[in-house]
Structures are given as C-alpha cells and as structure tokens.
C-alpha cells in the first residue's frame, strides 16, 4: 500500500489581527495559545524580581500537531472548535469561561482648543499636598486676576473641513484598518497692522458764518464768570494762577476765607453790590449824625469858664478826648468817599467794584463803630451824675445869643 500524502503545513505566523479584532484560527491548539494573551507574572513578591521580563516567542508546532490540524480543516464537523477563516465569526471561543465579540475600533479625535489657550500639562497641574497638604494655603486665591486684554484681529484663511475616516469592507466581510485622510494644513496667520492716521481737517464753515478768533479762546478759563457757571466744571489751579484771575473767581475756596467769598459774591452781582453800598452808606451816615454834634458840643465845653460851670470843668480831660475822637472819625468817613468821588470824575468807573477799596471801607466802618461805642462810654462816665436841669443849663450856654 502506498503511504498517504503528507499535507502541506499551513502558515503559522499570522494567527491574529489585533487591530481589526478578528482571529484567524488554524487549529485548536493555536486558538488556545492566542486566547491566553495575558502575560503571567513570573516574579516574587515585587515586580522588581521578575525572572523573564520579555515574552518568549511561541514554539513551532510539532509534525504530529500539524497533521491533526490539517485533518481538522478538511473535516470541520469532527472538531467543532475549529472555524473557517473565510466566514467572519460572530463569537469566537478563547477560553472555557466566556466568549469575545469582535469590536470595530474607531479613532478618537479631540475637539480643538480655542486660540490662545494652551493644553494643560498633567504633570504640572497635579496637586502638591504631601502629608499636610490639606492645611496648605492655596496661593492662587490671593492672586489678583488681571483683566483680559482685547485680542488683536487676526486674518485667517478658511481651512478645509475635517474628513471622517472611511471604513472599507472587503467582499469577504472582514473589516480592515480605517483609512484616515489628513486635513490640509492651514497657512500661517498674519496679524493685521493698524492703518496710519492722518490729521483730519475741519469741515469748511457754511457761507455767512465767521470762524471764532483765537483771542476769544484765551478766555476759556474765565467761563466761571458767566451766568451759567454752575453747569460748567470747576478747574483746579495753583495759588499763582488764582491770584492772577479776576476778583469774582468762585473756584478759590481753599485759599480764601468765607468773608472773602461773600465779598466776591456781593461784587459779582450788580443788585447785591448796590445793596451793599447802600448798607455801608446808611451806617456811615448814622455815625456822622452822632459825631458831628458831639464835636460841636465838646468844642464849646472846652472853652467854658470853670467858675460858672464847675461840672464841665471837672471833666476837661474827657471833653478833650471826645473832641479828638470826633475829628478822627469824621475824617475817616469823609476822606475815602471824597477820594472815590475824585477817581470817578477822572474816569475810573470801576472803583466801587474793587475788592481792596471795598475792604478798606468795611474796615473803616468797623473802626468808626468801635469809636462810637467808646464815645458813649466816656459820656456816660463823665456826665451820669448831672441832673437834667444842669445838662439843659449847660446846653443853653451854647446859644450865642445868651
């Protein structure tokens, strides 16, 4: 008898396709070898003492096993564990405990980050706590966040849309590796440069309208003297600039007294200024009505004989003091008004609106009022003990007909 022909050994290198998830089984022994893919730990207590750190290649099948596998391919019913390679199996046994279904792998794509945002580094972002990390203070809490600066416009060109991977299935039903088309790289972005600015010329004025001269613009600091000064913002100037400005400057609040402000307000308005001068005039008129008769009486008392008028002769010193006070007060009142009248006749018409003149008049008025009070006190001290008859008798002595 002729010996049977030896079957041709099938290729043993290509047993599995790990990326596609399909097993091409050739024999039962090879399927068991493929199923046990987990490397066994051949070490001691720690992984540092492993004996074999690299996996050994699978041993080649013996000729007896090759003969059995060839028979199993010819008659699949004899060995139900074998599966034909042409048919894509739904479930492939790899162990006695369960089965594994083939899974199609899909490439994972991450969403692109917005411009200006960096991808977080997992090594740097790890919390550094240590043993007492719970009690450590977070340094980022006290850091003040600066406002984000507005992004400069960037000229970008449209990029090609992303192409999803296409899956190609062969006619046999076994999926292959997904084919991914790479998107076209975008051109480098070029930042926009600001356009140069040129001085803008003013629009021409309509016919019949004159341009404002530059001389009027110089008086922009004195807008506070206008009627609508309350609506305009007040300007802060130094002391030298305030002294150079007009009398009615209402912005100089910190450097002048309240009385100065009141005087400035009085002089600024015509009605209040006239009312103020009327008050000053009436007060000085009353002072003159007191001191003019007093001067005449004291002038007569000084010349009376001591034998006939012993009461008057006893107060000679007081009479002389009152006579001098009366002359001084009348001169203080008369000279300023006479001077103002002369200046008005010479052409200086703003004397009544001058702040120094106004201050001088008010100081003289207060001084004359104090002399008035002093004169009243001296008269009461000198002639309080005289009765009305003696006073009347002394006054009759002033009559030149007697």
Curated annotation (Swiss-Prot):
S-S pairs: none
UniProt KW Cell division keyword: no
Coiled coil (UniProt feature): none
Transmembrane segments: 279-299, 325-345, 360-380
Keywords noted in UniProt: Cell membrane, Membrane, Transmembrane, Transmembrane helix
Protein topology in the membrane: Multi-pass membrane protein
Keyword field contains Chloroplast: no
Disordered: region residues: 1-213
Principal subcellular localization: membrane
Ranges of Basic and acidic residues composition bias in the record: 30-39, 49-67, 135-148
GO cellular component: plasma membrane
Subcellular location: Cell membrane
Compositional bias (Low complexity): 158-185
Bias kind Pro residues: ranges: 1-10
Superkingdom of origin: Bacteria
Designated name of the protein: Uncharacterized protein MG144 homolog
Organism of provenance: Mycoplasma pneumoniae (strain ATCC 29342 / M129 / Subtype 1) (Mycoplasmoides pneumoniae)
Taxonomic lineage of the native organism: Bacteria, Bacillati, Mycoplasmatota, Mycoplasmoidales, Mycoplasmoidaceae
